[in-house]
């Protein structure tokens, strides 16, 4: 009978333990990643409740043991082995009250932990030899105690080490979870020796020793080691929290300063000054499916800086939770209605007040508000305009929802300041808000005027004339929304200075505007190659580049390609990849694009063709221009023309020079994603003979081409279709015999020669200051 009762009690104990474990959070995954300076990160994922662990470190054997209270383990594989110089194995086990992770190390180590979302990050370093571990008293093993004494012994914990391996839940259910204080150098004892630890020996460990958690060892992952990591290690991560907020984590090891944070419409721009991001680490995350205010996260390089661009949607607010140097956390929260501002918000309301029940018949509203004030603990002040009676019957409703129902029924609204709530008709509160804002505006308009000089560094002061809508006749704020009615702006072109006279708030707005606009403009190096090619060379060039790919059908995407962006020309019915889309010589195929990866091969092909006398490079100019500034290249000569003018009965003759040049005008426009939109104008002028009546006069033959195309950084825009044709007659004869009349024709050979050439222009823009765009001369 006693045996059956014991089994029943044991079964109930196991079931209760399993129920408690199931109700808590579970460890679902363990991942290990590496950081510079031989540091490891063990990322422990939870399904719901997150527990910050408590643990200890041993040096012989080298182990780190971490306990997660009220946590279970939901992993198929609970022993993970690694071929790593520091971490060798991770073992996971659980009992009725907690889960334990044992990290087996190849050498003594130290750790610290950090909670990040639904994960606990464990940072592991090698032990610092300069920090000596505190001495820990050793406890000798005692004779094994009977099972009854073990069951009666209280469950005690030690903060130094454990002399037993972590046993599964079934074994723990039969015996209390006991821990003993042992020497740091003592190896883990078998399970049978653990059960021999008596209650006296557990109690013999002084309270100070039990409470002496190795805080020094846990904190021994110093900030110096993290800061000593090589620079330029940058990464981003995104997750969603329980408040439907987007959490963006930016790790920028080697950056010790503070980021510059600015907001432009629906973009949050975080700039790390003088922190260079490798091109391979640039990335963009589309996170719109997470249903947070964050739609997209982009990490990119801008000159010598690193920019994090957060694209948002809807109403939001930014919270900077950054703490450690080099690690930044930004929380983008959905913006809800603020009781102090009284703004309108159509989002569903969340009520968290204590539930109450109300049942009234024709009761004064002021009485209901008084009851709600007592239930909520808030101080409610009702306006004299709040009156009338209501019939109300509510059961188990949060008090704040009951208050909201009362206000909606009587068109009331509230403003909250601390724990004082002011309730009045909505129109009355809106009138008060308007009066308050008008009073603030009047005070600002009547405030003292100040003058501030802003000397621009990069922009021309005349550019701000159009931005601020200023002119010489009217420099007051009558035509400007930024300047107040009493303010004024003066422009000094000699010193490139803006002189602003206005209130402090307006001057501060000017300061922010100038900081955003007065920045160095990006520069573009435009390299043009003007080539005169024999007829058919463009077709040969397209065939050679197309032959580098594989023949493929239209629906087959396995062929390798150089990556041509686009082209205008014939369609290959077999789907051959032409890397430069110049397969035909028709004028319709006069524009093509070559991606940056193919530009090097294109230059080699042009050099080879020139050595074979198939092409001739007429000019190869390079010009550096700023973004959105026109660059002009001309090559040619001026032709004198005689102009006769008749005036007042007399005539005068003047000589004018007209340009006959090969001109190229390019205006680059850099897009936010690093592409370049080029507006190109090409004119080819040459002298020609024109018939005018019975006379032949000198004229200029003109050919123009205007286009606009988008090219990637380092790509090449090819413009062709400008042809020149020379027709000539040849005469070959035998000396003397060919000069005899009539008979001489037998000794002559006449022929016609047609030389047709195509003018090809290759334009390659490169954004200066970006990786991989160094020019070679």
From Swiss-Prot:
Disordered: region residues: 135-156, 197-236
InterPro entries: AMIN_dom, GspD/PilQ, NolW-like, NolW-like_sf, Pilus_4_PilQ, Secretin/TonB_short_N, T2SS/T3SS_dom, T2SS_GspD_CS
Membrane topology term: Peripheral membrane protein
The organism's place on the tree of life at top rank: Bacteria
Subcellular localization(s) per the UniProt record: Cell outer membrane
One Gene Ontology term from the biological process aspect of the record: establishment of competence for transformation
Record keywords: Cell outer membrane, Competence, Membrane, Protein transport, Signal, Transport
UniProt main location, coarse: membrane
Region forming the signal peptide: 1-24
One cellular component (GO) term of this entry: cell outer membrane
Biased composition (Low complexity): 135-154, 197-233
NCBIfam families per UniProt: IV_pilus_PilQ (TIGR02515)
Family label: Belongs to the bacterial secretin family. PilQ subfamily.
Binding partners and assembly: Homododecamer. Tetramer of trimer.
General function of this protein: Required for type IV pilus biogenesis and competence. Could function as a pore for exit of the pilus but also as a channel for entry of heme and antimicrobial agents and uptake of transforming DNA.
Record's protein name: Type IV pilus biogenesis and competence protein PilQ
């Amino acid at each position: 009978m006693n045996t059956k009762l014991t089994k029943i009690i044991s079964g109930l104990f196991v079931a209760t333990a399993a129920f408690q474990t199931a109700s808590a959070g579970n460890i679902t995954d363990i991942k290990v990643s590496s950081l510079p300076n031989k540091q490891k990160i063990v990322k422990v994922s939870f399904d719901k409740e997150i527990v910050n662990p408590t643990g200890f470190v041993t040096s012989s054997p080298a182990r780190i043991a971490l306990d997660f209270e009220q946590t279970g383990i939901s992993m198929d594989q609970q022993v993970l082995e690694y071929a790593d110089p520091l971490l060798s194995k991770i073992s996971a086990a659980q009992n009725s009250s907690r889960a334990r992770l044992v990290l087996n190390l190849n050498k003594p180590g130290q750790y610290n932990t950090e909670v990040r979302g639904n994960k606990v990050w464990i940072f592991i370093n090698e032990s610092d030899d300069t920090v000596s571990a505190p001495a820990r008293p050793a406890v000798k093993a005692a004779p094994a105690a009977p099972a009854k004494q073990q069951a009666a012994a209280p469950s005690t914990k030690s903060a130094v080490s454990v002399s037993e391996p972590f046993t599964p839940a079934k074994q723990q259910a039969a015996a209390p979870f006991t821990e003993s204080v042992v020497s740091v150098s003592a190896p883990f004892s078998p399970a049978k020796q653990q059960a021999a630890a008596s209650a006296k020996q557990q109690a013999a460990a002084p309270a100070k020793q039990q409470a002496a958690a190795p805080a020094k060892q846990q904190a021994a992952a110093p900030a110096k080691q993290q800061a000593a990591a090589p620079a330029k290690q940058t990464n981003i991560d995104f997750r969603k929290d329980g408040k439907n907020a987007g959490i963006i984590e930016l790790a920028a090891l080697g950056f010790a300063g503070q980021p510059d944070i600015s907001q432009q419409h629906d973009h949050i721009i975080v700039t790390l000054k003088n922190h260079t991001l490798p091109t391979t680490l640039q990335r963009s995350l589309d996170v719109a499916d997470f249903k947070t205010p964050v739609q997209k996260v982009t990490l990119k390089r801008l000159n010598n800086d690193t920019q994090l661009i957060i694209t948002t949607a809807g109403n939001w607010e930014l919270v900077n939770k950054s703490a450690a140097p080099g690690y930044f956390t930004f929380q983008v929260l959905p913006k809800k209605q603020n009781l102090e501002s009284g703004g309108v918000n159509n989002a569903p309301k969340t009520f968290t007040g204590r539930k109450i029940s109300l049942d009234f018949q024709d009761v004064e509203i002021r009485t209901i508000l008084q009851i709600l004030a007592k239930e909520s603990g808030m101080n409610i002040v009702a306006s004299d305009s709040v009156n009338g009676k209501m019939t109300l019957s509510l059961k188990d409703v949060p008090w704040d929802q009951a208050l909201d129902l009362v206000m909606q029924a009587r068109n009331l609204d509230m403003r909250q300041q601390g724990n004082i709530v002011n309730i009045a008709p909505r129109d009355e509160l809106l009138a008060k808000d308007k009066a308050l804002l008008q009073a603030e505006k009047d005070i600002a308009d009547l405030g003292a005027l100040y003058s501030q000089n802003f000397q621009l560094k990069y922009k021309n002061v005349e550019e701000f004339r159009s931005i601020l809508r200023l002119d010489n006749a009217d420099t007051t704020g009558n035509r400007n929304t930024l300047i107040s009615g009493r303010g004024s702006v003066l422009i000094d072109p000699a010193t490139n200075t803006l002189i602003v006279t206005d209130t402090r708030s307006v001057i501060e707005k000017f300061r922010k505007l100038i900081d955003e606009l007065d920045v160095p403009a990006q520069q573009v190096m435009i390299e043009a190659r003007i080539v005169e090619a024999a007829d058919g060379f463009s077709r040969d060039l397209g065939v050679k580049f197309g032959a580098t790919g594989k023949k493929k059908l239209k629906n087959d995407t396995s062929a390798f390609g150089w990556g041509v962006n686009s082209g205008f020309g014939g369609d290959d019915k077999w789907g051959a990849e032409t890397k430069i889309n110049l397969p035909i010589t028709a004028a319709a195929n006069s524009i093509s694009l070559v991606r940056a990866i193919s530009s090097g091969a294109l230059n080699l092909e042009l050099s080879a063709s020139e050595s074979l006398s198939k092409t001739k490079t007429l000019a190869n100019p390079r010009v550096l221009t700023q973004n959105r500034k026109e660059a002009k290249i001309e090559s040619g000569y001026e032709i004198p023309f005689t102009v006769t003018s008749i005036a007042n009965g007399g005539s005068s003759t003047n000589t004018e020079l007209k340009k006959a040049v090969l001109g190229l005008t390019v205006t680059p426009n850099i897009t936010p994603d690093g592409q370049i939109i080029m507006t190109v104008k090409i004119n080819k002028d040459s002298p020609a003979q024109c018939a005018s009546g019975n006379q032949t006069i000198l004229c200029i033959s003109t050919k123009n081409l205007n286009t606009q195309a988008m090219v990637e950084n380092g790509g090449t825009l090819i413009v062709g279709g400008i042809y020149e044709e020379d027709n000539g007659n040849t005469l070959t004869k035998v000396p003397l015999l060919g000069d005899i009349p009539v008979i001489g024709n037998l000794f002559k050979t006449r022929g016609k020669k047609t030389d047709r050439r195509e003018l090809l222009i290759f334009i390659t823009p490169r954004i200066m200051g970006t990786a991989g765009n160094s020019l070679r001369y």
